[in-house]
Amino acid sequence: MKIICNICYKETILGPEEKEKYFPNDPDDSIRYSECKECRYKRLCLELPLIYRDAVDDYNVMAKLDINKSYFFYGDTGAGKTFSAIEILKRRWENGQSGRFISYPELIFSIQTNYEQNAEMVDEIKKYKQLIVLDDFGAEKMTDFVRQVSYLIINYREQNKLQTIITSNFTLDEIDMYIDRRISSRIAGMCEIVRMSGDKRLTKK
């Protein structure tokens, strides 16, 4: 059986075991058109901020991280929090897995602009079954509304054991003090806490 990418037209021949696993009802000499892994990866990378699309892991941070875990990366601006989160996301994409990158301040702004229109977005994000990266949590202006939306998302994902990576300039203690104790509690229960130092190297708490 032959698979042809509908973007780059690269051809892949499936062996009998793969064919039986993925397309058991197709004839052995059939042809399917489907996006190849490389084209899928390039398409997904277009959803990332431009500066991270082709970033290189010079500090080898991935040697210390598990692409299937939830993390809370905290530290000063420029310490490598977003880079590390995106590296995990990109590795999952390379493996054919799914995941989404979300700028948290932009999400909150969209929701505040028209909550009724964007309420479904909150529900979709909190229930998304694959990895969600919530980048720059706490950078948005904190109001009771923002606290409630944040709690709804993080509480649901913690309770349902959905992989989540959160980046923030705040420590958990600061989230506890300035944002919401319930949120810091859920993050602590869901994520491995990793402090990012100024030289972009990882130090586990």
Regions found by a protein language model. Give the residues of each.
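A short, basic N-terminal segment
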Residues: 1-63, 193-194, 198, 204-205
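P-loop NTPase Walker A phosphate-binding motif
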Residues: 83-96
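Short glycine-rich substrate-engagement loop in P-loop NTPases that contacts/grips substrate
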Residues: 74, 93-128, 141-144
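Loop/turn-to-beta-strand initiation segments
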Residues: 97-98, 128-131, 160-166
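Walker A/P-loop nucleotide-binding motif
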Residues: 68-86
